[in-house]
Amino acid sequence: KVDKLTFTVTGNGVNQTVKTNAKGEIQIDNLMPGVYTVTEMDYDKYEPQESRRVTVVSGQVSTVTFNNKLKRGDLQIVKSSEDNLNEGVTFHLYGTSLSGIAVDEYAVTDENGVATFEDVLISGSTPYTVEEVDTAVRYVVPEAQSAPINWNEVTNRSFLNILKKFSVTVTKSDAETDTAQGDASLAGAVYGIYKGETLMDTY
């Protein structure tokens, strides 16, 4: 967007505020020869611009150029897990920036479990959302988190993958009577937990 941006031109007794047209241009006619200062109003979504000085020469058109850059920041995700398998995990960052542009980006963790979103447009009043993508089935899926992005700052978030746990209750009974017969006892039986054909533990 380049229209309706406000500039102030000062110098040689002139102090005039003007707005850009649809082409992003302003034009002030009939200025006396001399040096003038052109200043752009600060906008939350743009990096601040330095004022520029321009020399007006009689009979010539003097030009000064401004190039607005949208403010950006970074987001760093640190992933940890109970089994320390933290590389190659994908995170998704999404939302609407302060400038109204949609943000929809992905980053993958490195060997240290760190995923970095660089040069992200700053967020508005509503922060972005960051979530882990395609969480491995062995983990409890971590909740998504809010992630505001501020200009020239690094926002930090951490995600912990917790292994799914389970419990097994075994009740031994007699196949015919459901209770022990005669002097027999159902106590003291040993059970094994297997992964495939591998015995993992006994109880």
Model-predicted regions and their roles:
Residues K1-Y203:
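Solvent-exposed loop/turn and edge beta-strand elements of beta-rich ligand-binding domains
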